Amino acid sequence: MVEPREQFFQDLLSAVDQQMDTVKNDIKDIMKEKTSFMVSFENFIERYDTMEKNIQDLQNKYEEMAANLMTVMTDTKIQLGAIIAQLEILMINGTPLPAKKTTIKEAMPLPLSNTNNEQTSPPASGKTSETPKKNPTNAMFFTRSEWASSNTFREKFLTPEIQAILDEQFANKTGIERLHAEGLYMWRTQFSDEQKKMVKEMMKK
């Protein structure tokens, strides 16, 4: 027969063993959860790295598109300035610049517009006009720096009277912005309907 004291220790050891088994099982569960968490965390890090790379790629593409857009806008402004400048030359000189495959002798004079501004008349009966003209140099031979300078262009092609009108209208503008504004103003106010029609026909060639 087991003595009470010995039975007590046996029961105590059995309880301790059961408690140890419980602790071991809890530790196993914790390790499984840790492993699962680490896998999930690694997957998250991988997705984050992929997302960060995609964001960087998008940013690079955006910067490239912005640079390309700025280049296109600059070139467009220069080309628009060239077109506006040639329209002003047409109005001031009364003779269109030669179109492609057309010689200067073949170019027909534009009719005078109904304005109070002084404009030169096309030569008649082989006689040259007594009114002094501005230099009709083809504006397409201008350099980019000249396109950017409204004053350079205006001194070469515009009469003092028209320059005074434009100075009053666009005193707050400079450079290409002013050149565009002057060209649009003159196109809208100085060109006759017939002149506009002829210019549009020329630009289609």
Curated annotation (Swiss-Prot):
Q: Where is the composition biased (Polar residues)?
A: 112-138
Annotated segments matching region Disordered: 111-138
GO terms, biological process: symbiont-mediated activation of host autophagy
Q: Where primarily located?
A: host cell
Per its UniProt entry, which superkingdom is the organism in? Viruses
Which cysteine-cysteine pairs are annotated as disulfide bonds in the entry?
Answer: none
Q: Which residues form a coiled coil?
A: 10-75
| Compartments (UniProt record) | Host cytoplasm
Q: What induces it?
A: Expressed in the early phase of the viral replicative cycle.
Is Coiled coil one of the keywords? yes
Keyword set for this entry?
Activation of host autophagy by virus, Coiled coil, Host cytoplasm, Host-virus interaction
Q: Which GO terms describe its cellular component?
A: host cell cytoplasm
| Its biological purpose | Induces host endoplasmic reticulum stress and consequently activates autophagy and NF-kappa-B signaling pathway. In turn, may induce autophagy-mediated STING1 degradation and innate immune evasion.
Family as reported in the entry's similarity comment: Belongs to the asfivirus K205R family.
Q: Mind telling me what this protein is named?
A: Uncharacterized protein K205R
Query: Can you name the source organism?
Result: African swine fever virus (isolate Tick/South Africa/Pretoriuskop Pr4/1996) (ASFV)
